[in-house]
Design a protein with these regions (language model features):
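Nucleotide-activated chemistry modules centered on ATP-dependent adenylation/adenylyltransferase
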Residues: 1-192
């Protein structure tokens, strides 16, 4: 089963390509508080909400209702790294291994026993993920990871996240494929 919150084009195409037909998907609609929408108009991104923890708790309900034993996600090893110099602080705690442990303990002690929440990609780096992903050409034209362009189902090709994904994939993919994905050579873009 594939759990999907507020599906977009890339989500639907990725699930389909991965073998999760519509009958193997569970859809949930998430709405935002009006104040959050006002902040969006001011330029703030939704990434400032603890989205991964929302996913964890809502996926727990879906797993329970569908008699699933595991909730599997895709947070890589770097989700544990500190994002504040000389501090043990990550700005996305809900993507960390510590959160996985805390969540599992909380669920077991306060809600139910028998469902495990974990990240399959936890042991590997973003570099290793990029190397593996580069072998999956069927996903090239459909995957998206740009926060700014996500509402329009595209890469904006102007933000740090687009540049990061471009850089991390570039050792493993040819330039033509990279340009087909992003629309241009981001390494040649002086504004980035």
């Amino acid at each position: 089963m594939c759990y999907v919150i507020n599906p977009r084009g890339a989500t639907e195409e990725t699930a389909e390509t991965a073998g999760y037909g519509e009958n193997k998907r569970c859809y949930v609609k998430r709405t935002l508080d009006k104040n959050m929408l006002e902040l969006n108009k001011q330029g703030y991104l939704n990434g400032h909400t603890p989205f991964s923890s929302i996913v964890a708790f809502s996926a727990l309900i879906v797993a329970y209702l569908n008699k699933k034993k595991y909730i599997v996600l895709s947070n890589e090893a770097s989700a544990n790294e500190s994002t504040i110099y000389e501090e043990e602080v990550n700005h996305q705690y809900s993507k960390s291994y510590e959160f996985e442990q805390d969540f599992n303990e909380y669920v077991k002690e306060n809600i139910l026993d028998g469902i495990e929440y974990f990240s399959l990609l936890r042991p590997i780096s973003e570099y290793q993920i990029a190397k593996h992903f580069a072998k999956l050409s069927e996903f090239y034209s459909i995957f998206k990871s740009c926060n700014a362009g996500s509402k329009e189902n595209k890469w904006c090709a102007n933000c740090p996240k687009c540049l990061f994904v471009y850089i991390i994939l570039s050792p493993f993919m040819n330039k033509k494929d990279m340009i087909n994905i992003f629309g241009e050579d981001l390494l040649e873009k002086e504004s980035l």
